[in-house]
Amino acid sequence: MHELYQPREIEAAAQTFWDEQKSFEVSEQPGKDTFYCLSMFPYPSGKLHMGHVRNYTIGDVISRYQRMLGKNVLQPLGWDAFGMPAENAAIDNNVAPAKWTYENIDYMKTQLKSLGLAVDWSREVTTCKPDYYRWEQWLFTRLFEKGVIYRKNGTVNWDPIDQTVLANEQVIDGRGWRSGALIEKREIPMYYFKITAYADELLESLDELPGWPEQVKTMQRNWIGRSRGMEVQFPYDQASIGEAGALKVFTTRPDTLMGATYVAVAAEHPLATLAAQGNPALQAFIDECKGGSVAEADVATQEKKGQATSLFVEHPLTGEKLPVWVANYVLMHYGDGAVMAVPAHDERDFEFATQYGLPIKPVVRTSAGDQTPAPWQPAYGEHGELINSGEFTGLTFQDAFDAIEAALVKKSLGQSRTQFRLRDWGISRQRYWGCPIPIVHCDTCGDVPVPEDQLPVVLPEDVVPDGAGSPLARMPEFYECSCPKCGAPAKRETDTMDTFVESSWYYARYASPHYEGGLVEPNAANHWLPVDQYIGGIEHAILHLLYARFFHKLMRDEGLVTSNEPFKNLLTQGMVNAETYFRMETSGKKTWINPADVTLERDAKAKVISARLTSDGLPVEIGGTEKMSKSKKNGIDPQTMIDQYGADTCRLFMMFASPPDMSLEWSDSGVEGSHRFLRRVWRLAQAHVTQGPSTGLDVAALSDEQKAIRRAIHQAIRQASQDIGQNQKFNTAVAQVMTLMNVLEKAPQDTPQDRALMQEGVETVALLLAPITPHISHELWKQLGHNEPVIDAGWPAFDASALVQDSLQLVIQVNGKLRGHIEMPASASREEVEAAARVNENVLRFTDGLTIRKVIVVPGKLVNIVAS
């Protein structure tokens, strides 16, 4: 065994062994417990970042631990390879997205392998390859024929920079999530998944996921947004509208109906179109509204604007005429594109009515009283007893709901209804680098799905996009085809699918990635699925995780899987943060500086007191810790860390610095500390191994000192097992090993018993660290005399008898202050402990002249004597 810890050699040897032995390639083994651990697959952006390292290390620790429990563990990896960044990079570098993507995959795969991940690379999937997306197209055609996918014109978020449609979730503060461009509204034909047909199940089956963070489930519940309310009809005022009919609105607060003072409609509503005839000002306002975002979150925060029309509707219960307004806060695609406005009890209506001088009529007595003066108070929206509501005055919320519902039903002007905030998922993208939509447009036959024997519709990979819309729409050699039904000349669909489609089912393909008879091989899929542990960032709580749950139910209904949910347990890892530094330019712009280019000055307590740019020695501003990013220039290259310290050091730091679900603050000194610890482990093992083999341990013959050492070993096993296996607190598991190391480093190695005990101790360190620092553990286990690799060694079981103590050392306090210790038999009663404490020399000294009022005994820990 080499005297010095040499991570480069150790890690290369371990990885070569795993590769040659195909250690992590698995197959179905009926009768053996399985564990499917999956971290969200990466986009091949070019290089790993520390977020990747943390994500995949967490998954690897869990996978290796479960393997040591004797389970058949699947941990696959692949590439979420379609998407706009590849197109943008291709435009910038004049290279085909396929070439850029495959080169990035090769480089990043090498980086991932250098981390020593226990991944079954034989199951690698790449979503931009035809052998993957062929099955996506296959499922698309089946769902299209069933009506689960349909085509219609829709108002969409159009990104003018990326020249594509964005889902509502991809619009942030009115801007595209990737380009940052202001979003426009457009009407175009699109393909939609009918996710709303599964809204109830998606909502209710969240209760079947106890292993998911409550925060994620709440976010999904809110996004699905089921609400019970009423559809209310406001009859048209025929004198102003010129025809019979009624305006339909949905409300969750029918109890406030008597407080409605106007109605508001979306810019696209037929009444808005009617009112705009001959009204240029109103038409201009409608056009302005149509240019805004269709994302509900943006509408909620934007300035409320409106235009009056000359139209009126009638209140369904009183017959009072209510004016019709066109308002930018009403969405055509939500509800019926119209709202009944009750300004006294709805914040948006209140803001709008205040701005335009519309009546505000309180009809609910709230904790704020009977009036609703400006500014808006949250109390105005409370449920309460009705006031100013005619025959309904005095009723509470539910009684008022029921009574007003009955009155409306009697007049055929209302009915109960359940509504969802969730909208159908529009998946058409006017981009090149995505999965082609397998539809042919025929003048005679309409939209015809491509037959299974003609799949896949292959995306040409030699295209270099220029950024002006979809290249496929300008490629006759791609879109010119014959109709599969009638054989007439037809046109292939040139839109591609939203890349969230690929990531909605990849976890299932891993179960049988080479299967050519379908999307999944059912036996393999049902052997491995659902995923036991899924790991990824909370930023995917709504988009990816909701879509994957939806897809799993689609696959279940197609008979491909039998389970209802894709992921049993979900761990949302925290971000990796690092210090930021900048200089403020005269223009007010911040120029960010890489931490590696900054020299820090610290005080005696290691607190940073100044920062200077190394190159010129002049001060820079300290910006605080923020998520590692290219824009802030505070990212750390994982490859640099691996080359300098080794993968085990990086893995250890990532697991020790913070619990996995919390943010981690990068620290160079923390990395160095992790490296020093591994050197200590190596030195201890090297010193032990150098003395030659040890004899077996005679537990019955252990001295008290040796029992204490063995107790520390088994306390570490018990606690680390709980920390890793139950709590997923890898940082405290590492802390247990560090505590054990402190004991072992002081332990004597004089007798055969000492050496046998040290053998057990060092073996335990190697085993407990094996999931976290697998390379050094691999080498230590071999050097400790074992023929089988540590990955095939079982997780250590603690010996309960080793934890039993004959005697305990208890802390003695007088009035809460430490005054000494006493040693007592472990079996001593509370009375015996108190009696011993009362006659302790220090207790007598510090209670001299005082009266003991109370004795508090905390069993096994301390005695506190209260005296005055």
Curated annotation (Swiss-Prot):
Q: What is the native source organism of this protein?
A: Pseudomonas syringae pv. syringae (strain B728a)
A single Pfam family it belongs to is tRNA-synt_1g
Q: Which GO terms describe its molecular function?
A: aminoacyl-tRNA deacylase activity; ATP binding; leucine-tRNA ligase activity
Protein name (database record): Leucine--tRNA ligase
**EC number per UniProt:** 6.1.1.4
Q: Broadest EC class?
A: ligase
* Family statement: Belongs to the class-I aminoacyl-tRNA synthetase family.
Name where it's found.
Cytoplasm
SUPFAM superfamilies in the record, alphabetically?
A: Anticodon-binding domain of a subclass of class I aminoacyl-tRNA synthetases, Nucleotidylyl transferase, ValRS/IleRS/LeuRS editing domain
Q: Which domain of life is it from?
A: Bacteria
Motif 'HIGH' region located where?
A: 42-52
- Do you know which InterPro entries this protein is assigned to? aa-tRNA-synth_I_CS, aa-tRNA-synth_Ia, Leu-tRNA-ligase, Leu_tRNA-synth_edit, M/V/L/I-tRNA-synth_anticd-bd, Methionyl/Leucyl_tRNA_Synth, Rossmann-like_a/b/a_fold, tRNAsynth_Ia_anticodon-bd
GO BP terms: leucyl-tRNA aminoacylation
